[in-house]
Amino acid sequence: MKANTKFIRTEILAGISSFLKATFYIIIVNPAILSEAGMPFSAVVTSTVLVCSFGSIMMGIYAKNPFIIALGMGLNAFFTYTAVLGLGLSYETALGAVFWAGILFLILSILKVRDKIVQSIPHALRYAIAAGIGLFISFIGLQNAGLIVDNPVTLVSLGSLKDPICLTFLIGLGCTAILISRNVKGAMIIGILLTTALAWPIGRWWGDASIVNFGVPTLVNYTGIFAMPDFSLFLKANLFGSIQYAFLPVVFVFAFTDLFDSLSTFVGLAEASGYKDEDGNPRNLKKSLLADAITTIFSGLVGTSSGTVYIESAVGIREGGKTGLTAITAGILFLPFLFFSPLLSIVPSIASSIALVLVGSFMMKPLTKINWSMPDEAIPVFFTMILMPLTYSITTGIIIGFLSWTLLKFFSGKKEDINPALLIINLLSLLYLWL
C-alpha cells in the first residue's frame, strides 16, 4: 500500500513539475501569437487550454506515456505569420488546414507509412527545418519587441534602444536568459512574469500606446481577472475552403512539421528516459502518434494551431514520471485557466516575444549533428534555414531545401542519396513554385 501511495505521489508531482516548469507559458504565448491573426484573445485562451488538456489526458490514458501535449511553437508562428498574414488566408481557412493536416497525420499513422516517409527525408534536412523554424520565430520575436524594425534602404535595422518597449524587452530577455543559464526551474514563466511586472510601471509612465498587447486590454486598462470561457472559435474552421489546390501546401507543411517534430521528440524522450520497447523503438509509439494526430484534428475544430508532444516533458520524467498519470495530471492542471483569460491578457506582447526568441535559440541544437565539411549537405541546410526568416515563409525554406539537396546530390555523383519519395516531394515543390 505504501509503495502504491509513493508511486502515485511521484507521478502526480512529476505532472505538476511538467506543467509549472515547462509548459505553462504556452497558455500565455499562444493566444498572444494567434491574436495577431485576428482571432479573439479570450477565445484562443479557451482553445489553447482545451487542446493542451485534451491532448495530455489522451496521451496518458490511451498511450500510457508521461508525455505532455501542448501547442507547438513554430506551428503557431506558421499559422499566423505565414498562412494568415503572409498568404492572406482567413484564420477560418487556416484552422481548416490544421484539421486536414491532422487527418493526413492520422492516416499516415494508421497505415504505418510514416516510417517510410521519415526515412526518405535526409537527416540533415530534418535538422535544418527545425533550426530554420527556430530562426523564423526568433526573428518574429525580435520584430514584435521593436529590436528589429523596417528600413527602406537595408530592409531591416536595429530599433531604438531608447524606446520603452525595446528597453523592457531587452531587460526581460537578459533576466530570462540568465535564469535559464543557471538552470533555474520554471525560468521561462518566471521571466515572463518579471517582464510583465517591469512593463507595468513603464506602461504607466509612457501611456497605453507604448505597451500594447494587440487589441486586448493593456497593462494599464485591464478588465478583470476571471471570465467565463469564450467558445466563439468552436467549429469555425473552413473545412472545404482549406482544401483548394492553392492552400494544399499549407496543409502539407502543417502535417509535415507536426509529423517530424513529434517523431523526433518521441525518439529524444525515449533515448533520455529509456522508455523503449523490445525493438528499441519508443514505447507505445503508434498510440502516441495517434494521440498526437487526433489532438491536431481537435485543434482545428476548437480553434487553434496544432497541438504536438513537448520535448519539455523530460522535466516530468526527470522528476520520476514513468506512466500516463504524469500526463493526465498536467492535463488536468490546464483546465482552471479556462476562467483566467482577462488575467492572462495583461501580459504584454514583449513578454511573449521573449519566449519566441529563446525557444528559437533552443531549436539550433540539431545543427551540431550536421557534417558541415560536406558542401552537398551544408549548402541545402543553409538555404533551408536562412530562407525561412528572410522570405517570412517556412514553406519556401522547406521547398528550396529539398530542391537544392536533390540538385547537388545529383551533380555530385551521389545519386544513391536520392530516393523515389524525395523525387515526388521535389516534383510537388516545383509544381507549387510554378503555379
What spans do the regions from the language model cover?
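Helix-loop-helix junctions within the multi-pass membrane cores of secondary transporters/permeases
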Residues: 3-31, 51-52, 72-81, 85-133, ...
